[in-house]
Amino acid sequence: MSETLNLLKQLIERPSITPNDAGCQTILIDRLKSVGFQCEHLPFGEVHNFWAWHGHQSPFIIFAGHTDVVPPGDETQWHSPPFTPTEKNGYIYGRGAADMKSGLAAMVVAAENFVKQNPDHNGTIGFIVTSDEEGPAENGTQKVVDYLQQKNIKLDYCIVGEASSNEKLGDAIKIGRRGSMHGELTIIGKQGHIAYPHLADNPIHRSFQAFEALAKTKWDEGNEHFTPTSFQFYNVEAGAGAANVIPATLKAKFNFRFAPIHTTQQLQQKVERILNYYQLNYDIQWNVSSQPFFSGNGRLATFVRQAIQEICHLNTEPNTYGGTSDGRFIATTGCEVIELGPVNKTAHHVNENICIADLEKLTDIYFRTLQLLI
Protein backbone atom coordinates (compact mmCIF):
# COMPACT_ATOMS: atom_id res chain seq x y z
CA MET A 1 0.00 0.00 0.00
CA SER A 2 1.31 3.46 -0.89
CA GLU A 3 2.13 5.92 1.89
CA THR A 4 -0.47 8.38 0.61
CA LEU A 5 -3.23 5.78 0.50
CA ASN A 6 -2.30 4.51 3.95
CA LEU A 7 -2.42 8.02 5.40
CA LEU A 8 -5.71 8.80 3.66
CA LYS A 9 -7.29 5.72 5.20
CA GLN A 10 -6.15 6.78 8.66
CA LEU A 11 -7.73 10.20 8.15
CA ILE A 12 -11.04 8.90 6.76
CA GLU A 13 -11.39 6.63 9.81
CA ARG A 14 -11.61 9.72 12.03
CA PRO A 15 -15.20 11.10 12.02
CA SER A 16 -14.04 14.71 11.94
CA ILE A 17 -17.39 16.41 11.38
CA THR A 18 -16.82 20.15 11.55
CA PRO A 19 -15.44 21.59 13.81
CA ASN A 20 -14.29 18.31 15.38
CA ASP A 21 -10.80 17.26 14.32
CA ALA A 22 -11.18 13.75 15.80
CA GLY A 23 -7.42 13.26 16.08
CA CYS A 24 -6.56 13.86 12.42
CA GLN A 25 -4.12 16.65 13.14
CA THR A 26 -2.22 14.58 15.69
CA ILE A 27 -1.54 12.03 12.94
CA LEU A 28 -0.29 14.73 10.57
CA ILE A 29 1.82 16.50 13.19
CA ASP A 30 3.49 13.26 14.29
CA ARG A 31 4.47 12.49 10.71
CA LEU A 32 5.79 15.98 10.03
CA LYS A 33 7.77 16.05 13.28
CA SER A 34 9.38 12.73 12.36
CA VAL A 35 11.09 14.37 9.36
CA GLY A 36 12.14 17.52 11.21
CA PHE A 37 9.21 19.92 10.93
CA GLN A 38 8.58 22.27 13.83
CA CYS A 39 4.90 22.33 14.76
CA GLU A 40 2.66 24.59 16.83
CA HIS A 41 -0.86 23.77 18.01
CA LEU A 42 -3.03 26.86 17.60
CA PRO A 43 -6.47 26.13 19.09
CA PHE A 44 -9.08 28.88 19.02
CA GLY A 45 -12.33 28.08 20.80
CA GLU A 46 -13.34 24.54 19.91
CA VAL A 47 -11.38 24.63 16.66
CA HIS A 48 -8.09 22.76 16.23
CA ASN A 49 -5.40 24.33 14.05
CA PHE A 50 -1.72 23.78 13.57
CA TRP A 51 1.15 25.58 11.94
CA ALA A 52 4.27 23.68 10.86
CA TRP A 53 7.47 24.67 9.05
CA HIS A 54 10.78 23.26 7.84
CA GLY A 55 13.60 25.59 6.83
CA HIS A 56 14.60 29.16 7.65
CA GLN A 57 14.90 30.96 4.32
CA SER A 58 12.75 32.53 1.66
CA PRO A 59 10.81 31.80 -0.41
CA PHE A 60 8.14 30.50 1.93
CA ILE A 61 5.74 27.98 0.38
CA ILE A 62 2.68 26.90 2.33
CA PHE A 63 0.44 23.89 1.96
CA ALA A 64 -3.02 24.65 3.37
CA GLY A 65 -5.97 22.42 4.11
CA HIS A 66 -8.65 21.29 6.52
CA THR A 67 -9.33 18.11 8.45
CA ASP A 68 -13.03 18.76 9.06
CA VAL A 69 -15.72 17.28 6.84
CA VAL A 70 -19.43 17.83 6.30
CA PRO A 71 -21.89 15.37 7.91
CA PRO A 72 -22.46 12.17 5.94
CA GLY A 73 -26.22 12.64 5.72
CA ASP A 74 -28.42 9.55 5.52
CA GLU A 75 -25.93 6.74 6.11
CA THR A 76 -28.35 4.15 4.71
CA GLN A 77 -27.72 5.70 1.29
CA TRP A 78 -24.00 4.87 1.50
CA HIS A 79 -22.93 1.50 0.13
CA SER A 80 -20.28 1.35 2.88
CA PRO A 81 -20.00 3.17 6.23
CA PRO A 82 -18.85 6.76 5.56
CA PHE A 83 -16.03 6.60 8.11
CA THR A 84 -14.80 3.17 7.07
CA PRO A 85 -12.40 3.65 4.14
CA THR A 86 -13.50 1.14 1.52
CA GLU A 87 -11.69 0.23 -1.70
CA LYS A 88 -13.87 -0.74 -4.65
CA ASN A 89 -13.08 -0.90 -8.38
CA GLY A 90 -10.01 1.31 -8.11
CA TYR A 91 -11.63 3.95 -5.90
CA ILE A 92 -11.57 4.60 -2.18
CA TYR A 93 -14.84 5.63 -0.56
CA GLY A 94 -15.45 7.60 2.60
CA ARG A 95 -16.48 11.03 3.85
CA GLY A 96 -13.65 13.44 3.15
CA ALA A 97 -12.06 11.27 0.45
CA ALA A 98 -12.28 14.13 -2.04
CA ASP A 99 -12.84 17.10 0.28
CA MET A 100 -10.14 17.18 1.37
CA LYS A 101 -8.36 14.39 3.17
CA SER A 102 -6.79 13.08 -0.03
CA GLY A 103 -5.25 16.51 -0.65
CA LEU A 104 -3.91 16.60 2.91
CA ALA A 105 -2.46 13.11 2.67
CA ALA A 106 -0.75 13.86 -0.65
CA MET A 107 0.69 17.17 0.59
CA VAL A 108 2.12 15.66 3.75
CA VAL A 109 3.69 12.68 1.97
CA ALA A 110 5.11 14.95 -0.75
CA ALA A 111 6.67 17.23 1.89
CA GLU A 112 8.05 14.23 3.82
CA ASN A 113 9.67 12.82 0.69
CA PHE A 114 11.09 16.18 -0.34
CA VAL A 115 12.63 16.88 3.07
CA LYS A 116 14.10 13.38 3.29
CA GLN A 117 15.78 13.84 -0.09
CA ASN A 118 16.69 17.49 0.49
CA PRO A 119 17.26 18.01 4.24
CA ASP A 120 19.09 21.30 3.62
CA HIS A 121 16.73 22.59 0.95
CA ASN A 122 16.41 26.23 -0.03
CA GLY A 123 13.38 28.14 1.15
CA THR A 124 10.89 27.12 3.81
CA ILE A 125 8.01 24.64 3.55
CA GLY A 126 5.03 25.21 5.81
CA PHE A 127 1.58 23.86 6.63
CA ILE A 128 -1.59 25.61 7.80
CA VAL A 129 -4.25 23.07 8.77
CA THR A 130 -7.61 23.75 10.43
CA SER A 131 -10.77 21.94 11.51
CA ASP A 132 -12.97 24.97 10.72
CA GLU A 133 -13.31 25.23 6.95
CA GLU A 134 -16.67 23.54 6.44
CA GLY A 135 -18.24 25.56 9.27
CA PRO A 136 -18.23 29.28 10.08
CA ALA A 137 -14.49 29.56 9.28
CA GLU A 138 -14.06 32.10 12.08
CA ASN A 139 -11.52 30.33 14.32
CA GLY A 140 -9.51 28.53 11.69
CA THR A 141 -7.21 29.65 8.90
CA GLN A 142 -8.13 33.30 9.37
CA LYS A 143 -6.90 33.25 12.98
CA VAL A 144 -3.72 31.36 12.04
CA VAL A 145 -2.92 33.91 9.33
CA ASP A 146 -3.44 36.72 11.86
CA TYR A 147 -1.04 34.94 14.22
CA LEU A 148 1.62 34.61 11.51
CA GLN A 149 1.31 38.26 10.56
CA GLN A 150 1.77 39.26 14.20
CA LYS A 151 5.02 37.28 14.12
CA ASN A 152 6.05 39.05 10.88
CA ILE A 153 6.19 35.78 8.95
CA LYS A 154 5.96 36.58 5.23
CA LEU A 155 4.36 33.95 3.02
CA ASP A 156 5.29 33.85 -0.67
CA TYR A 157 3.35 30.94 -2.17
CA CYS A 158 0.42 28.80 -1.06
CA ILE A 159 -1.13 25.64 -2.45
CA VAL A 160 -4.58 24.88 -1.05
CA GLY A 161 -5.33 21.18 -1.47
CA GLU A 162 -9.04 21.60 -2.22
CA ALA A 163 -10.63 19.38 -4.85
CA SER A 164 -10.06 21.66 -7.85
CA SER A 165 -10.10 19.15 -10.72
CA ASN A 166 -13.28 18.63 -12.74
CA GLU A 167 -13.15 15.44 -14.81
CA LYS A 168 -9.50 14.36 -14.61
CA LEU A 169 -6.81 15.05 -12.04
CA GLY A 170 -5.03 18.27 -12.96
CA ASP A 171 -7.47 19.46 -15.62
CA ALA A 172 -8.16 22.65 -13.61
CA ILE A 173 -6.60 24.76 -10.89
CA LYS A 174 -8.01 27.79 -9.10
CA ILE A 175 -6.07 31.05 -9.37
CA GLY A 176 -8.68 33.12 -7.54
CA ARG A 177 -12.17 33.00 -6.09
CA ARG A 178 -15.26 35.17 -6.16
CA GLY A 179 -16.37 36.93 -3.01
CA SER A 180 -19.57 36.11 -1.14
CA MET A 181 -21.96 38.57 0.50
CA HIS A 182 -25.30 37.86 2.17
CA GLY A 183 -28.20 40.23 2.70
CA GLU A 184 -31.08 39.84 5.15
CA LEU A 185 -33.95 42.06 4.08
CA THR A 186 -37.14 42.90 5.98
CA ILE A 187 -39.95 44.57 4.03
CA ILE A 188 -42.20 46.42 6.47
CA GLY A 189 -45.94 46.67 5.83
CA LYS A 190 -49.02 46.89 8.01
CA GLN A 191 -50.89 43.90 9.41
CA GLY A 192 -54.62 43.68 8.82
CA HIS A 193 -57.64 41.51 8.06
CA ILE A 194 -57.40 39.84 4.67
CA ALA A 195 -60.98 40.89 3.87
CA TYR A 196 -60.08 44.57 4.35
CA PRO A 197 -56.87 45.05 2.36
CA HIS A 198 -57.43 48.81 2.13
CA LEU A 199 -56.81 48.98 5.88
CA ALA A 200 -53.51 47.11 5.64
CA ASP A 201 -50.28 47.33 3.66
CA ASN A 202 -49.31 43.94 2.22
CA PRO A 203 -45.49 43.60 2.20
CA ILE A 204 -45.73 40.55 -0.07
CA HIS A 205 -47.47 42.47 -2.84
CA ARG A 206 -45.20 45.45 -2.35
CA SER A 207 -42.10 43.29 -2.83
CA PHE A 208 -42.92 41.68 -6.17
CA GLN A 209 -41.62 44.37 -8.52
CA ALA A 210 -38.50 45.10 -6.52
CA PHE A 211 -37.64 41.41 -6.21
CA GLU A 212 -38.12 40.90 -9.92
CA ALA A 213 -35.88 43.90 -10.63
CA LEU A 214 -33.18 42.55 -8.32
CA ALA A 215 -33.37 39.08 -9.88
CA LYS A 216 -33.14 40.46 -13.43
CA THR A 217 -30.43 43.05 -12.84
CA LYS A 218 -27.23 42.49 -14.80
CA TRP A 219 -24.65 43.50 -12.24
CA ASP A 220 -21.67 43.27 -14.60
CA GLU A 221 -20.31 41.37 -17.59
CA GLY A 222 -17.55 39.62 -15.68
CA ASN A 223 -14.08 39.69 -17.22
CA GLU A 224 -11.55 37.31 -18.72
CA HIS A 225 -10.94 35.69 -15.34
CA PHE A 226 -14.31 35.91 -13.57
CA THR A 227 -17.86 35.01 -14.56
CA PRO A 228 -20.54 37.72 -14.16
CA THR A 229 -21.70 38.53 -10.65
CA SER A 230 -24.50 36.25 -9.46
CA PHE A 231 -27.46 37.37 -7.30
CA GLN A 232 -29.76 34.71 -5.83
CA PHE A 233 -32.61 34.75 -3.33
CA TYR A 234 -32.41 31.66 -1.14
CA ASN A 235 -35.10 32.24 1.47
CA VAL A 236 -38.37 34.21 1.55
CA GLU A 237 -40.74 34.12 4.52
CA ALA A 238 -44.01 35.89 5.31
CA GLY A 239 -47.23 35.12 7.11
CA ALA A 240 -48.90 35.82 10.42
CA GLY A 241 -49.84 32.23 11.26
CA ALA A 242 -53.46 32.54 10.14
CA ALA A 243 -55.09 32.37 6.71
CA ASN A 244 -57.14 35.53 7.22
CA VAL A 245 -54.32 37.90 8.21
CA ILE A 246 -52.19 40.09 5.98
CA PRO A 247 -48.70 39.92 7.53
CA ALA A 248 -46.85 42.94 8.81
CA THR A 249 -43.47 41.94 7.38
CA LEU A 250 -41.76 39.86 4.72
CA LYS A 251 -38.24 38.57 5.28
CA ALA A 252 -35.92 37.62 2.45
CA LYS A 253 -32.34 36.39 2.31
CA PHE A 254 -30.10 36.62 -0.73
CA ASN A 255 -26.49 36.10 -1.76
CA PHE A 256 -24.03 37.75 -4.11
CA ARG A 257 -21.07 35.93 -5.64
CA PHE A 258 -18.94 38.69 -7.06
CA ALA A 259 -15.61 39.41 -8.73
CA PRO A 260 -13.09 42.10 -7.79
CA ILE A 261 -14.91 44.28 -10.36
CA HIS A 262 -17.05 45.67 -7.52
CA THR A 263 -16.59 46.65 -3.93
CA THR A 264 -19.15 45.34 -1.47
CA GLN A 265 -20.25 48.92 -0.83
CA GLN A 266 -21.05 49.44 -4.52
CA LEU A 267 -23.25 46.34 -4.61
CA GLN A 268 -25.01 47.33 -1.40
CA GLN A 269 -25.74 50.80 -2.74
CA LYS A 270 -27.16 49.41 -5.97
CA VAL A 271 -29.51 47.08 -4.07
CA GLU A 272 -30.70 49.92 -1.88
CA ARG A 273 -31.29 52.17 -4.90
CA ILE A 274 -33.61 49.53 -6.37
CA LEU A 275 -35.50 49.13 -3.10
CA ASN A 276 -35.85 52.90 -2.77
CA TYR A 277 -37.05 53.23 -6.37
CA TYR A 278 -40.01 50.99 -5.53
CA GLN A 279 -40.69 53.04 -2.38
CA LEU A 280 -40.32 50.16 0.04
CA ASN A 281 -40.11 50.58 3.78
CA TYR A 282 -37.32 48.17 4.69
CA ASP A 283 -34.46 47.21 6.93
CA ILE A 284 -31.40 45.43 5.56
CA GLN A 285 -28.45 43.75 7.25
CA TRP A 286 -25.29 42.82 5.35
CA ASN A 287 -22.72 40.11 6.00
CA VAL A 288 -19.60 39.88 3.84
CA SER A 289 -18.46 36.30 4.34
CA SER A 290 -15.52 36.53 1.96
CA GLN A 291 -13.76 39.03 -0.27
CA PRO A 292 -12.72 37.97 -3.78
CA PHE A 293 -9.09 37.35 -4.59
CA PHE A 294 -7.10 36.86 -7.77
CA SER A 295 -3.52 35.62 -7.83
CA GLY A 296 -3.23 35.35 -11.61
CA ASN A 297 -0.68 33.32 -13.51
CA GLY A 298 2.33 33.99 -11.32
CA ARG A 299 5.44 31.93 -10.64
CA LEU A 300 3.62 29.33 -8.54
CA ALA A 301 0.84 28.82 -11.08
CA THR A 302 3.42 28.50 -13.85
CA PHE A 303 5.34 25.77 -12.01
CA VAL A 304 2.16 23.95 -10.98
CA ARG A 305 1.04 23.85 -14.60
CA GLN A 306 4.46 22.52 -15.60
CA ALA A 307 4.27 19.79 -12.94
CA ILE A 308 0.78 18.77 -14.10
CA GLN A 309 1.94 18.64 -17.71
CA GLU A 310 4.92 16.43 -16.80
CA ILE A 311 2.95 14.00 -14.61
CA CYS A 312 -0.60 13.99 -16.02
CA HIS A 313 0.19 15.09 -19.60
CA LEU A 314 -2.56 17.70 -19.44
CA ASN A 315 -2.74 21.40 -20.19
CA THR A 316 -4.52 22.59 -17.09
CA GLU A 317 -7.19 25.30 -17.11
CA PRO A 318 -6.66 28.10 -14.57
CA ASN A 319 -10.04 29.40 -13.41
CA THR A 320 -11.92 31.11 -10.60
CA TYR A 321 -15.14 29.05 -10.63
CA GLY A 322 -16.95 27.64 -7.62
CA GLY A 323 -17.53 28.69 -4.06
CA THR A 324 -15.19 30.06 -1.43
CA SER A 325 -12.16 28.48 0.22
CA ASP A 326 -9.68 29.33 2.95
CA GLY A 327 -7.38 30.61 0.23
CA ARG A 328 -9.18 33.94 0.65
CA PHE A 329 -7.63 34.43 4.09
CA ILE A 330 -4.12 33.59 2.95
CA ALA A 331 -4.38 35.82 -0.13
CA THR A 332 -4.80 38.88 2.12
CA THR A 333 -1.09 38.60 2.99
CA GLY A 334 -0.09 39.25 -0.63
CA CYS A 335 0.88 35.60 -1.06
CA GLU A 336 0.29 33.94 -4.45
CA VAL A 337 -2.46 31.37 -3.85
CA ILE A 338 -3.58 28.53 -6.09
CA GLU A 339 -5.87 25.61 -5.39
CA LEU A 340 -4.82 22.21 -6.67
CA GLY A 341 -6.38 18.95 -5.63
CA PRO A 342 -8.33 15.88 -6.74
CA VAL A 343 -11.50 15.56 -8.80
CA ASN A 344 -14.39 17.33 -7.09
CA LYS A 345 -17.40 15.50 -8.57
CA THR A 346 -18.32 13.61 -5.37
CA ALA A 347 -17.35 16.20 -2.74
CA HIS A 348 -20.12 16.43 -0.09
CA HIS A 349 -22.05 13.65 -1.89
CA VAL A 350 -23.21 10.29 -0.60
CA ASN A 351 -20.53 7.70 -1.47
CA GLU A 352 -17.82 10.35 -1.74
CA ASN A 353 -14.76 8.81 -3.40
CA ILE A 354 -11.42 9.39 -5.05
CA CYS A 355 -9.53 7.41 -7.69
CA ILE A 356 -6.71 5.56 -5.94
CA ALA A 357 -4.35 6.00 -8.91
CA ASP A 358 -4.79 9.78 -8.61
CA LEU A 359 -3.35 9.77 -5.09
CA GLU A 360 0.17 8.96 -6.26
CA LYS A 361 -0.06 11.40 -9.14
CA LEU A 362 -1.24 14.18 -6.85
CA THR A 363 1.61 13.45 -4.45
CA ASP A 364 4.05 13.60 -7.37
CA ILE A 365 2.61 16.93 -8.58
CA TYR A 366 3.09 18.50 -5.16
CA PHE A 367 6.61 17.05 -4.92
CA ARG A 368 7.57 18.28 -8.39
CA THR A 369 6.20 21.75 -7.62
CA LEU A 370 8.47 21.92 -4.57
CA GLN A 371 11.43 20.94 -6.75
CA LEU A 372 10.66 23.69 -9.24
CA LEU A 373 10.04 26.38 -6.62
CA ILE A 374 12.92 25.78 -4.21
Swiss-Prot record:
Zn(2+) 1 binds at H66, D99, E162. The keyword 4Fe-4S does not apply. Its cofactor is Zn(2+); Co(2+). GO terms for biological process: diaminopimelate biosynthetic process; L-arginine biosynthetic process; lysine biosynthetic process via diaminopimelate. The keyword Amino-acid biosynthesis applies. Zn(2+) 2 binds at D99, E134, H348. Its EC number is 3.5.1.18. Belongs to the peptidase M20A family. DapE subfamily. Catalyzes the hydrolysis of N-succinyl-L,L-diaminopimelic acid (SDAP), forming succinate and LL-2,6-diaminopimelate (DAP), an intermediate involved in the bacterial biosynthesis of lysine and meso-diaminopimelic acid, an essential component of bacterial cell walls. This is Succinyl-diaminopimelate desuccinylase.
